[in-house]
Amino acid sequence: MSVNSTTAAAIAFLHECFESDNGRHELGSIFSSKVEQLLFSPAGSLQVPDDYRNTVLPIIESYRREKSFRHFSYFIIGKQKSNRYGKTTVSTVCAPLFSFEASLEKQQVLDTSSLSVNNFALSLWPNEKALKEAFSANSTDNIQTQHDAIIERLSASNPDIPITLSTAEFHDKASFNKAFKGIELGHYYLVAMDACAVVEKSISTRGILDELSLLAAGDQFSKPLQLSLGADLASEFHNVKPANHQLIPGILSNAQKEALTCAAESEFSLLIGPPGTGKSYTIACLALERFMQGESVLIVSKNEHAIDVIKDKITETFGLSQSSIMRAGTKGYHRELKQHLDHILQEKSHKNTLSKERSPSGSQLKKSLNQVNNDLRMAEAELIKRFRRAEHEGELLHQLESGLGNFRWLKQVRLWWSQRYSNSQGLLQESLKKIQNLHKKRDDLLAKNIDQSATNKINHTLFHHRRQLTGFKSALSARTSSRQEKILAGLDFSILLESMPIWLCSLEGLHKTLPLIPELFDLVIIDEATQCDIASCLPALQRAKRAMVVGDPKQLRHISFLSKNKQQALSEKYSLSREINYRDHSLIDLAQRHIQQQSSIIMLNEHYRSAPDIIRFSNENFYDSRLRLMTEKPTLTTKNSIAVIHVEQA
């Protein structure tokens, strides 16, 4: 089997795993508008009448991507209090607990390997995580007869919430309302019933599944995607500029400098960022450095907040123009992109832009930067020299004091010696102040350099590709999606990346934001990778020439409800030659397993956040004392970071 066919089989396997795992729908009520063609039955006796089958079959065939046919077992009934826009409301919920892949056979036989647990039903319990893990680890083949076991699991996870088995039956919304009219707030019932229905798939899940389908059917895969799945490929580098940390405002640690090098030189790399080690700041540095080297960068994560934090660091901390960075996948994304294009297209004529691009300001800026960097090197060398000399003088004084004893005249000698040394060398504090001022001057010059680089990129794109940019704007203004797709199909998306090289997006929003073009970006950075399942990351990996996976293996992984039996069956179906564990492994596990060069794995080892007493436990027990505690200062050693307070009758 060739490398491409092996990769395609692995993608098809992960596609089915993801589809089975995300076949569950977070339904607050089986009577939701997302559900149609409901058919109820007592537990274990669901049959599909011919007229029902004839109605549902055309729907499933016509909307295979948008809708699915599901079998539901057990329902959690209760009243839920919610607060929206400052107004508290109480509503009755009828949430299915389990769902399965279903067929339109007359007699329904459950495929228990496809069992999924409805997240909404579990979220009704405060101890949701423990409940998820209980059902994930203990799914049973005879789920329809396990009334007592289910009640026991629900009660054990949260004993303060009463739940009882109800014998009530219902066949539609009206009969449900009648059966549970007097239900009390805070008490839940488990109803042993079955139902089948056509359910609308979530848009985000649908997008990932569609792109996985396209990948599985294709034969062109990016290097990072193949390497992540264990392919043995030779490294290839074409015109990649080496990393230059001098382009970044601020001071970087050695590990952060190594990360810059790794992002430039490695096709598949891993950045381990324990809490408080500046992970988001480092990602911002990585993106900015590659931007300054003329490359495009895609930053993705499952966590929307993590993406926003990185964007703020790039624009606010480093001052990169909003016109050079695009936060995609959000509700107002198309409007924001159109505004960006409007701003770019309103620039002055190409003659003026070219004159700006060739203006002497760029060379003058570099000359000033070189001068400041030289001054910094000299000032730092002088500081080290003074420090060592002061250290030597101090040792001499100590020896003199020890040898001559505590004579009165010795104090006068020490005072004279100290004054003589200070007058000749100056205070170390003065040297530090000089270095701080030089760093400030350097950072200001680098900020101007970044701004100049962004302007030059826009000017270059305007001069050579204004027509293409106008085409993108026309596509965004199109009233119908079909018209939009038709315009976009004739455009070169890489041109848009010339003027806006840095893009940030959630994994779920990627499909509606960027075309699935192999190696569209030079670099993709996948943040919070510990929480990312393998399948949802593949479309992002396909879009880049190089990839850096970022996260912390010590943090909690994503939770999957895919059963082991189902995963094993799918693995056998596709005859996988490489073991891929979708259920238990995240993308970061895959990176740790398949990265072969140790130089492609970097750990940020300087902790800046917590007091030493707080982080020391984690450092010693989880990170093998590899973290350097940058908060460990003499002024903090006298403070107690942890206090034990005894509370009576607590």
PLM regions: where:
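Conserved helicase NTPase catalytic core signature
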Residues: 158-254, 382, 405-520
